[in-house]
């Protein structure tokens, strides 16, 4: 086997480089490169060579196959080192004297001086935009799972929604729909019509009208109005009966409490009259 070994000028003095050609196999003709230290130790790869030399030599630009230093990599590394050293030497002075604290807007009203070149111009403002705060989509779902209790700490039974009301959106239950409609009745002055767009069922995250509750569009018929009127009349009648019973009970309680003091006062008046009759009249001289 033909072996050629010669001195490697890129490495320290005494290091030799050897090329061994392969005679057979799929990689026939390929040459294996080895390096030998002055003591005769053999190295088969660049990592072995770097571990052996350690910090005595920089092998970042060394080509293990050719045994030479790559000049383009050497120039780039020199430029990088020169740039880093110049930055470290010069540096930018920190002239900022502000305290390193977060600057937030003041919650207190502060005077503002208005300077303008056109005093006749008027500033237009829309107070409605400042009042209406943006809301999350499907924020009504946060109200689901909440229950109401009366003064006796008993659970209040939730009302049943009409059959014509159907929810819209992912995971919209009857409880969520009831909370959404109740919130719309208390927080909005607009008429409740539901989601009028038909595309909201395909992609509610895009076509949802945030001004309306999470329900499909519905129509209020005369039959619905009649049923609601009957329900209101029944509730009013029950309320009237309850108020009347409470008033009668209150009157009876006052009557029972007023009998004893009244009898006692009458008895005291009779005793005073008897004492006045028993007193003798003074004799006349």
UniProtKB/Swiss-Prot annotation:
GO terms for biological process: chromatin remodeling; embryonic organ development; epigenetic regulation of gene expression; in utero embryonic development; negative regulation of DNA-templated transcription; positive regulation of DNA-templated transcription; regulation of cell fate specification; regulation of stem cell differentiation. Residues 268-285 have a biased composition (Acidic residues). There is a cross-link at residues 73, 90, 92 (Glycyl lysine isopeptide (Lys-Gly) (interchain with G-Cter in SUMO2)). It holds the Pfam family MBDa. It is found in: Nucleus; Chromosome. Keywords: Chromosome, Coiled coil, DNA-binding, Isopeptide bond, Nucleus, Phosphoprotein, Transcription, Transcription regulation, Ubl conjugation. GO terms for molecular function: DNA binding; methyl-CpG binding. Highly expressed in brain, heart, kidney, liver, lung, skeletal muscle, spleen and testis. Detected at lower levels in embryonic stem cells. Residues 1-69 form the MBD domain. Residues 255-285 are annotated as: Disordered. Residues 255-267 have a biased composition (Basic and acidic residues). GO terms for cellular component: chromatin; cytoplasm; heterochromatin; nucleoplasm; nucleus; NuRD complex; protein-containing complex. CDD domains: MeCP2_MBD. Signal peptide: none annotated. Residues 221-279 form a coiled coil. The modification Phosphoserine is found at residues 56, 85, 144. Acts as a component of the histone deacetylase NuRD complex which participates in the remodeling of chromatin. Acts as transcriptional repressor and plays a role in gene silencing. Does not bind methylated DNA by itself. Binds to a lesser degree DNA containing unmethylated CpG dinucleotides. Recruits histone deacetylases and DNA methyltransferases. Heterodimer (via N-terminus) with MBD2. Component of the MeCP1 histone deacetylase complex. Component of the nucleosome remodeling and deacetylase (NuRD) repressor complex, composed of core proteins MTA1, MTA2, MTA3, RBBP4, RBBP7, HDAC1, HDAC2, MBD2, MBD3, and peripherally associated proteins CDK2AP1, CDK2AP2, GATAD2A, GATAD2B, CHD3, CHD4 and CHD5. The exact stoichiometry of the NuRD complex is unknown, and some subunits such as MBD2 and MBD3, GATAD2A and GATAD2B, and CHD3, CHD4 and CHD5 define mutually exclusive NuRD complexes. PANTHER family: METHYL-CPG BINDING PROTEIN, MBD, METHYL-CPG-BINDING DOMAIN PROTEIN 3. This is Methyl-CpG-binding domain protein 3. The gene is Mbd3.
